[in-house]
């Protein structure tokens, strides 16, 4: 039986949505489809393959994800290698050093959000950004109209297409994506900041799912005998 490529473009989008909230895995396929913009078949195939790999478990309270941290790690690695490079729109640079130093005062156009290093800084103030990731659902020209950036193929501002449809904080992308951006940088200071995000913002990525599944199947076994 041919396995579905969970960690290619459509699969990565589905897994990203599932990891956002523990209840997302319990939602109807059609609702999941609408939130991420992939086909209904892709949603079903991803969930079937995740179940086959042991990441999705059926309990008396509905489906849950187990081994969330392992699934997160797989998603982060494959997101940075497979999907993120395809999302790149282009690069820009701040017009002046003063603009760069005052980046927090920039009112990003509606439809744009900080990712990576600036998002980490806005989250806990720990990391001073060197590279400025921005995720956008509108043309890059809207950012130029702010008057503080310019086109520069070698610039420190990297624009990526947004790949989800639900509303998020209007300044930063979801914490999982901040974590992924930082982990993908390969920079030691970013890796340290990523661990802070994991510890403080992604506390629920524990092995609770395994315990719930174990409890469910233990109860089922006892009832059968």
Language model segments and positions:
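Short alpha-helical segments that sit at the start of domains
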Residues: 1-16
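Loop-centered beta-sheet repeat module
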Residues: 15-73
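Long, well-ordered mid-to-C-terminal structural blocks that present hydrophobic/aromatic surfaces
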Residues: 68-84
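Long, low-complexity, charge-rich intrinsically disordered regions
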Residues: 80-216, 220-225
């Amino acid at each position: 039986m041919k396995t579905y490529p969970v960690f290619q473009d459509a699969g990565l989008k589905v897994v990203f949505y599932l990891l956002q909230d523990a209840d997302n895995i319990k939602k109807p396929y059609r609702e999941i489809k609408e939130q991420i913009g992939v086909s209904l078949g892709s949603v079903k195939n991803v969930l079937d393959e995740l179940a086959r790999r042991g990441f999705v478990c059926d309990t008396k309270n509905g489906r849950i994800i187990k081994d969330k941290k392992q699934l997160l790690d797989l998603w982060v690695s494959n997101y940075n290698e497979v999907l993120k490079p395809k999302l790149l729109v282009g690069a820009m640079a701040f017009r002046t050093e003063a603009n760069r130093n005052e980046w927090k005062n920039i009112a990003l156009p509606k439809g744009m959000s900080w990712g990576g290093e600036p998002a980490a800084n806005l989250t806990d103030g720990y990391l001073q950004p060197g590279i400025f990731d921005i995720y956008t659902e509108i043309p890059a020209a809207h950012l130029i109209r702010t008057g503080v950036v310019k086109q520069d193929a070698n610039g420190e501002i990297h624009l990526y297409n947004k790949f989800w449809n639900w509303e998020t904080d209007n300044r930063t992308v979801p914490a999982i994506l901040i974590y992924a951006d930082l982990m993908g940088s390969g920079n030691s200071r970013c890796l340290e900041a990523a661990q802070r995000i994991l510890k403080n913002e992604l506390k629920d990525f524990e092995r609770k799912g395994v315990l719930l599944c174990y409890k469910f199947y233990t109860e089922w076994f006892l009832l059968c005998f």
